[in-house]
Amino acid sequence: MTFRARREVLRTILTGERCIHPGSVYDAISIRIAEDLGFELGMFGGSAASLAVLGDPDIALITLTELADQMRRMSRAATLPVLVDADHGYGNAMNVRRTVQELEAAGAAGLTIEDTLLPQAFGAAKPQLISLAEGIGKVKAALEGRGDPALVILGRTGAVSVTSLDDAIARARAYEACGVDGLFFTGITARDQLDAIAAATTLPIVLGGAPEHMSDLGYLAARRVRVALQGHAPIAAATQAVYETLKALRGGAAPKQLKGLPSAELTAQVMREAEVKRRLRVYLEPGS
């Protein structure tokens, strides 16, 4: 599937009538597993990227180059469309333009640009937002930076939990007026908040998370939520699995005593072993 085709799949999801959960992906193995299990979309979150690439928490330490390189590896490994958390665009509006270009070239189906002030400012006790004017500039730069018009650009705001619901709506409407393809919200914890946002905007909505009492897909779909994230449990589970395996080995366990290891069949599937063997026969065996 071409990069353009992957982007069209994401656009179809956003313009549809359903709400889906994406698979949280962060490397070649996780994206192949998500694809094999039938997920329609992958989500490459900033926290997962920081942990997978750097082993660090999500405090804006990862660079654009590191993020794009990891996205490129996933694009090569599978054809599952991926929505990328591009954080603040790695600088000002000029940097945002470059961010879009790099992630587009890396095969992202879509990306989010947020209005959080990143990295955290000196002396700041809690998250802060950039001004609406600067946020608009970043969104405009993102839209103008894409070479493929099919690349999905989402305006993202965390204003609901940082400033106010009214500010979140004002920012969302401003980003909508700029021409973004959808709106990404974090910090929504109550139905009346989502109801107000849905009533004040017209674009597809992506939720960065929602409490259990708001998890009904029918309710979310009726509020134009087309994608609802469920956190990044896969990388957390992988971390625990590696820890338990190494702990057992360090404690004297024999490899055959280890629990939770994948079957040979699953390992072969994730490695696409059958296809690799076919290529070896075709490319390297005489007379093939």
Curated annotation (Swiss-Prot):
<dbReference type="InterPro" id="IPR039556">
    <property type="entry name" value="ICL/PEPM"/>
</dbReference>
<feature type="binding site">
    <location>
        <position position="156"/>
    </location>
    <ligand>
        <name>substrate</name>
    </ligand>
</feature>
<feature type="binding site">
    <location>
        <position position="232"/>
    </location>
    <ligand>
        <name>substrate</name>
    </ligand>
</feature>
<keyword id="KW-0460">Magnesium</keyword>
<protein>
    <recommendedName>
        <fullName>Oxaloacetate decarboxylase</fullName>
        <ecNumber>4.1.1.112</ecNumber>
    </recommendedName>
</protein>
<comment type="similarity">
    <text>Belongs to the isocitrate lyase/PEP mutase superfamily. Oxaloacetate decarboxylase family.</text>
</comment>
<feature type="binding site">
    <location>
        <position position="85"/>
    </location>
    <ligand>
        <name>Mg(2+)</name>
    </ligand>
</feature>
<dbReference type="GO" id="GO:0019629">
    <property type="term" value="P:propionate catabolic process, 2-methylcitrate cycle"/>
</dbReference>
<dbReference type="Pfam" id="PF13714">
    <property type="entry name" value="PEP_mutase"/>
</dbReference>
<dbReference type="InterPro" id="IPR015813">
    <property type="entry name" value="Pyrv/PenolPyrv_kinase-like_dom"/>
</dbReference>
<keyword id="KW-0456">Lyase</keyword>
<keyword id="KW-0210">Decarboxylase</keyword>
<keyword id="KW-0479">Metal-binding</keyword>
<dbReference type="GO" id="GO:0006107">
    <property type="term" value="P:oxaloacetate metabolic process"/>
</dbReference>
<dbReference type="InterPro" id="IPR023687">
    <property type="entry name" value="Oxaloacetate_deCOase_bac"/>
</dbReference>
<dbReference type="GO" id="GO:0008948">
    <property type="term" value="F:oxaloacetate decarboxylase activity"/>
</dbReference>
<dbReference type="GO" id="GO:0046421">
    <property type="term" value="F:methylisocitrate lyase activity"/>
</dbReference>
<comment type="subunit">
    <text>Homotetramer; dimer of dimers.</text>
</comment>
<dbReference type="GO" id="GO:0042866">
    <property type="term" value="P:pyruvate biosynthetic process"/>
</dbReference>
<dbReference type="GO" id="GO:0000287">
    <property type="term" value="F:magnesium ion binding"/>
</dbReference>
<feature type="binding site">
    <location>
        <position position="47"/>
    </location>
    <ligand>
        <name>substrate</name>
    </ligand>
</feature>
<comment type="function">
    <text>Catalyzes the decarboxylation of oxaloacetate into pyruvate. Seems to play a role in maintaining cellular concentrations of bicarbonate and pyruvate.</text>
</comment>
<dbReference type="InterPro" id="IPR040442">
    <property type="entry name" value="Pyrv_kinase-like_dom_sf"/>
</dbReference>
